[in-house]
Amino acid sequence: MARIAGVDLPRGKRVDIALTYIYGVGRATALEILDTTGVDWTRNIDDLSADEVNEIRKEIEQNHKVEGDLRREISSNIKRLMDIGCHRGLRHRRGLPARGQRTKTNARTRKGPRRGVAGKRK
């Protein structure tokens, strides 16, 4: 089992699919990495030699921000927005959508489950 960027890549999967298990690597980035390293994307992870795995590992470490570094950068960007008090930062602070979506209805993913209002007493 190949281990790249602290992630165990699944056995028996194609290389381009297996690379997407790394946080920050999608299909397009995976194909770009494989194109740069010269590894055929149709091969299985099990079929790669140690040299090819090291080549992929080196490419990811040098030219791509993945896993912990990427998570840290994203959270620091959000924290910066909240600290400067801009509109997007305020929306993050309040747990509301930050990109202009409506909130009268919908937005339940961001707002969480409904909080019911007590009905009128008789």
Swiss-Prot record:
The alphabetized UniProt keywords are: Ribonucleoprotein, Ribosomal protein, RNA-binding, rRNA-binding, tRNA-binding
Q: Which gene encodes it?
A: rpsM
List GO terms (cellular component aspect): cytosol; small ribosomal subunit
Query: Does this entry carry the keyword Heme?
Result: no
Q: How does it assemble?
A: Part of the 30S ribosomal subunit. Forms a loose heterodimer with protein S19. Forms two bridges to the 50S subunit in the 70S ribosome.
Q: Which BP terms from GO are recorded?
A: translation
The name this protein goes by in its record: Small ribosomal subunit protein uS13
Outline what the protein does.
Answer: Located at the top of the head of the 30S subunit, it contacts several helices of the 16S rRNA. In the 70S ribosome it contacts the 23S rRNA (bridge B1a) and protein L5 of the 50S subunit (bridge B1b), connecting the 2 subunits; these bridges are implicated in subunit movement. Contacts the tRNAs in the A and P-sites.
Q: Residue ranges of region Disordered?
A: 89-122
Question: Which family does the entry's similarity section mention?
Answer: Belongs to the universal ribosomal protein uS13 family.
The GO terms describing molecular function are: rRNA binding; structural constituent of ribosome; tRNA binding
One Pfam family matching this protein: Ribosomal_S13
* Top-level taxon in the UniProt lineage: Bacteria
